[in-house]
UniProtKB/Swiss-Prot annotation:
Species assigned in the record: Aliivibrio fischeri (strain ATCC 700601 / ES114)
Record protein name field: High frequency lysogenization protein HflD homolog
Gene that specifies this protein: hflD
Phylogenetic placement of the source organism: Bacteria, Pseudomonadati, Pseudomonadota, Gammaproteobacteria, Vibrionales
Gene3D superfamilies in the record: HflD-like
Subcellular location: Cytoplasm; Cell inner membrane
Keywords assigned by UniProt, alphabetized: Cell inner membrane, Cell membrane, Cytoplasm, Membrane
InterPro entries: HflD, HflD-like_sf
Transmembrane domains' residue ranges: none
Amino acid sequence: MANTLFDRTIAFAGICQAASLVQKMAKDGHCDQEAFDTAIQSILETNPSNTVAVYGKESNLRIGLECLVRDFDNTPSGSELTRYLISLMALERKLAGHRDGMSKLGERIGTIERQLEHFDIHDEQMLSNIASIYLDVISPMGPRIQVTGTPSVLQQPMTQHKVRALLLSGIRSAVLWRQVGGKRRHLIFGRKKMVEQAKIILAQI
């Protein structure tokens, strides 16, 4: 895949979208359905033809692109999103250095793909199976991501499944970010360029 500013912006918007949806789901128990579907589908796109193919099309990343443009500020909402972002990228770095973990992740995603021949991806059991990949493969690499939200919402099993599935989608986008050449220096020194690129993409969708 190409290592361009466009590709890095798309991948980073994917991480932003996952973090934003986790925040919304944890507080309200629901989030934008199309964006959620895009996030879950991205997990299964293990051999994409290009960066955008992971998400279907640019417009499927509208929430993530808007989130990137707004940037992360010092408000409680902004700092929480930043914490999720940093945590997801830190977990992906641990995963990248863990060959067994990458192998297990691939196997478990393959199992999900086979199960989808018989079940709908929105079934509670399927979402539970996707969430269990995060619990079994990603979470033990630590440190755990502390998700904050409405306690009564977070206690619901279906919300827990969806939050963990979204966190897994964030890891998938973080893997993509690394694959297209994304590095920490791009976040420190190239943030303004990514914001400008995100604005261009948003204007075209």
